[in-house]
């Protein structure tokens, strides 16, 4: 009887342990109030699955800045796929996505939006923020090799999503028939193979009414493909108040075909 009671107690403990949500104790923003001059952790909000291939983070720092998110910043310029272990080592294979309204702005300073921490929710598996400049709520939830974005737009005839493949060699292609953007980035900080590329595929659930690509800061409407030092794309559509547009993003260091499988 005594052994039976001990077994019941042990099983009860196992069930309790499995049911407990330990993520409620995790604050991904902790340690992010850091800078080149002073570290309080040198972390960034890494929104990711355990052992995920990619992390996703809101980006407050400039392209190439190792301090890609700092708690004291007041503007977000994109939502970035990252593999960065520390600001000193920096990143590799990064690219970003950003919703904007009004004008199709690619420049990272001009597309940036004010935000406040009271409008921000950060957990290990989900991130949400209100972008005041554009009146857009952005949400993201990652899988092991992909991520799902949800953008809640205002009523606007000129709602856009910017895709920035970053500099140091990149490629982008808009595929309107498939509501899709594909591309690759070669940006890295060393320690990668000579043929290094991070291939990505982005699928939207809303047809495009506007399309443009960007080559080294030069926006070209109705041009759907660029291979250059710094490539990007902007797609757009009309939205009604509260309309939600979803974007599924997957990537691979092997090929576009593998990214589609991921």
Map each language-model feature to its residues:
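Bacterial Sec-dependent N-terminal signal peptides
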Residues: 1-20
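Accessory carbohydrate-recognition regions in carbohydrate-active enzymes
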Residues: 20-262
């Amino acid at each position: 009887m005594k052994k039976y009671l001990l077994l019941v107690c042990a099983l009860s403990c196992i069930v309790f342990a499995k049911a407990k949500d330990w993520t409620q104790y995790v604050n991904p923003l902790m340690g992010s109030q850091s800078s080149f001059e002073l570290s309080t952790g040198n972390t960034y909000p890494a929104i990711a699955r355990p052992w995920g291939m990619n992390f996703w983070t809101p980006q407050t720092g400039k392209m190439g800045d190792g301090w890609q998110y700092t708690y004291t910043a007041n503007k977000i310029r994109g939502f970035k796929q990252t593999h960065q272990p520390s600001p000193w080592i920096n990143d590799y294979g990064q690219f970003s996505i950003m919703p904007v309204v009004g004008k199709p702005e690619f420049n990272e300073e001009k597309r940036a939006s004010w935000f406040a921490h009271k409008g921000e929710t950060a957990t290990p598996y989900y991130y949400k923020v209100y972008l005041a400049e554009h009146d857009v709520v952005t949400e993201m939830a990652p899988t092991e090799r992909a991520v799902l974005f949800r953008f809640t737009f205002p009523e606007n005839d000129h709602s856009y999503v910017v895709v920035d493949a970053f500099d140091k060699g990149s490629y982008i292609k808009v595929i309107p028939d498939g509501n899709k953007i594909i591309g690759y980035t070669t940006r890295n900080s060393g320690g990668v193979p000579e043929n290094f590329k991070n291939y990505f595929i982005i699928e939207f659930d809303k047809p495009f009414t506007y399309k443009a690509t960007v080559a080294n800061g030069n926006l070209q409407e109705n041009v759907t493909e660029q291979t250059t030092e710094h490539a990007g794309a902007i797609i757009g559509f009309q939205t009604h108040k509260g309309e939600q547009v979803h974007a599924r993003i997957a990537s691979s260091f092997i090929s576009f075909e593998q990214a589609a499988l991921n």
